[in-house]
Amino acid sequence: MNFSKLKFGATIGIIGGGQLGKMMAQSAQKMGYKVIVLDPNEDCPCRYVAHQFIHANYDDEQALNQLGENSDVVTYEFENISSEQLKKLTQLYHIPQGYQAIELLQDRLTEKQTLLEANTQIVPFVQIQTNQDLLKAIEKLGFPFIVKTRFGGYDGKGQILVRNDSELDEAYQLVEKQECVAEQYLDIQKEVSLTVTIGNEQQTTYFPLQENEHQNQILFKTVVPARSDKENEARKEVEKITRAIHFVGTFTVEFFIDKENNLYVNEIAPRPHNSGHYSIEACDYSQFDTHILAITGQKLPQAIELLKPTVMMNLLGRDLDLLENEFSRHPDWHIHIYGKKERKPDRKMGHMTLLTDDVNQTEQYMLMKFEGRDK
């Protein structure tokens, strides 16, 4: 794809005003662009950094058209917009990301089928439409396996681990509500991710391989560079994926590494990703900078420079009181508070990034300060 470069002062429309939209807007503004954001939440984080705010639901066709008509280019911060709605918008307005990635990836079944056809390494899976299919999953996958809903399921929601026959009842209940996918359970050594930006004329820029740790299905911390020898292999898997799915802008591929050191593609996020937030301080370009460069038709940097090894930790609602007490003592902590009005114990309220010469020591220090987060 080749499209004209946007001039300074042009307007970028963003569908979604959460923290990703906010950080996109901040990158866009420092490059001289104006920003309009559409979000159903009146107090969304992006509202207070955007030049214009449209308060509307994501399926409000009139509001989406208003966004398109007032923007020179439109992007989105998340994958749960209707692909049909997005397809209509792409026929009327300039949306470089298109709708294909959303159409394929918001459904776990079509995502896995696409990855399989692209010849990437994925764990065995079974489509689950009925309770009878769960019995087939036992035959094909064996215990344990994970049942996931085909749609939705952000931050681990809509997932059930089935370890034996006695745990099938909860899976049956989930399948009765909606179609699912069952995946073979992996004995995981490590989780890693690779953030990538594809720009004008399919120029590709890779960020360093990121090592991720989750707690209660929510990303806890990211270490960069990943302590793994799988970066080149991960890039080769991404190349297969980009031949199968149209991308423009920043996206992230999540991987599992099992105890035998085999790399498996887990899932794809077709937009900037939580594990790439460290890049704001730790790289010469952030994942949001390269996203804006891509969708505005600008040339991407040939390579991303990691300025220093880094640990990034998500800040949840339960962390904020401690953070307020400690912040003034730690000028080396790069703090981002997203501006969400309602504080919940397990809600992502911000993140902090520490550049360090000793990643292991920094990890231990953060765990000590935020005691209980490693439980």
UniProtKB/Swiss-Prot annotation:
Pfam families: ATP-grasp, PurK_C, RS_preATP-grasp-like. It catalyses: 5-amino-1-(5-phospho-beta-D-ribosyl)imidazole + hydrogencarbonate + ATP = 5-carboxyamino-1-(5-phospho-D-ribosyl)imidazole + ADP + phosphate + 2 H(+). This is N5-carboxyaminoimidazole ribonucleotide synthase. It is an enzyme of class 6 (ligase). One of its GO terms (molecular function) is metal ion binding. Pathway: Purine metabolism; IMP biosynthesis via de novo pathway; 5-amino-1-(5-phospho-D-ribosyl)imidazole-4-carboxylate from 5-amino-1-(5-phospho-D-ribosyl)imidazole (N5-CAIR route): step 1/2. Belongs to the PurK/PurT family. Homodimer. HAMAP family: PurK (MF_01928). Its EC number is 6.3.4.18. PROSITE patterns: ATP_GRASP.
